[in-house]
């Protein structure tokens, strides 16, 4: 969002966006080094995937700056330097792109690849894992593992917009069950797989994720 606001393009744009984003990351690292020398306390840059911050910061930015297309027009902001969840990119290109930002995140970093159910395509999983091992510091595969306790549906439970309120809710595509107490939904956020459901900002982000395989 920062890069898009400052340059008008995504940080995946090789001519303008990426060089600008890398300069921002380097400046943040330089600031950490300056603070370290001044305070004799270690500072480091961390590529955070904070759960509530993505929603909280989005609402604060909307309140302060209004709605800016491609910047503050969603109820979430992108985690650290990740490729935006709606941007079409394959798994290998995404990992290669984000690896250059991980090198500038000495305090910690993580990248994700969104995949469908891969239980019948282990060869593809191993291919991505090998690429991760050879090319990036830390990355994980996100898949869907849901279960409806009403009808026994075993597949991806969808996010839909509730009639009238516009609220995002989880719905079994087989029987229409929307009772969160009667379904098991697992999604990776903040580096771990959670099953406790999420705020509206994070739910919108999950809904808009595109697959990378």
Question: What residues fall within each predicted segment?
Answer:
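Long, C-terminal-biased catalytic regions of enzyme "large/alpha" subunits
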Residues: 1-213
């Amino acid at each position: 969002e920062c890069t898009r606001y400052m340059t008008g393009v995504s940080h995946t744009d090789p001519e303008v966006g990426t060089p600008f984003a890398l300069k921002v990351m380097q400046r943040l690292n330089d600031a950490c080094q300056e603070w370290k020398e001044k305070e004799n306390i270690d500072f480091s840059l961390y590529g955070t995937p904070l759960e509530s911050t993505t929603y909280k910061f989005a609402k604060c930015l909307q309140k302060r700056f209004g709605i800016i297309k491609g910047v503050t027009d969603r109820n979430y902001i992108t985690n650290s330097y990740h490729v935006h969840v709606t941007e079409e990119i394959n798994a290998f290109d995404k990992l290669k792109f984000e690896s250059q930002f991980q090198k500038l995140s000495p305090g910690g970093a993580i990248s994700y690849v969104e995949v469908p159910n891969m239980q019948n395509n282990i060869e593809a999983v191993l291919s991505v894992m090998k690429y991760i091992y050879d090319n990036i510091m830390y990355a994980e595969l996100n898949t869907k593992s849901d279960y409806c306790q009403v009808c026994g549906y075993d597949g991806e439970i969808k996010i839909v917009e509730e009639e009238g309120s516009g609220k995002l809710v989880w719905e079994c595509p087989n029987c229409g069950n929307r009772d969160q107490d009667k379904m098991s939904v697992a999604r990776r956020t903040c580096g771990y797989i959670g099953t406790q459901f999420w705020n509206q900002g994070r739910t919108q982000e999950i809904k808009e994720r595109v697959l990378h395989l």
